[in-house]
Swiss-Prot record:
Induction: Expressed only in the forespore compartment of sporulating cells. This is Small, acid-soluble spore protein H 2. One of its GO terms (biological process) is sporulation resulting in formation of a cellular spore. The gene is sspH2. It is found in: Spore core. Pfam families: SspH. The keyword Chaperone does not apply. It comes from Bacillus cytotoxicus (strain DSM 22905 / CIP 110041 / 391-98 / NVH 391-98). Belongs to the SspH family. Coiled coil: none annotated. Keywords: Sporulation.
Amino acid sequence: MNVQRAKEISESAEQANVSFQGMPVMIQHVDENSETARIYDAANPERELTVPVKSLEER
């Protein structure tokens, strides 16, 4: 995924089908400078991670 699309998803009210290593996730925030995203596991919102945006996949 690219940074612009990740930002669109994070700012949208709609829920997108995004995954990280096969795990459904929600994007909280995108840092354009570092090209990373703060995500959390859709099934376990307390599990937060910061990952490279390019590692996210939209299904």
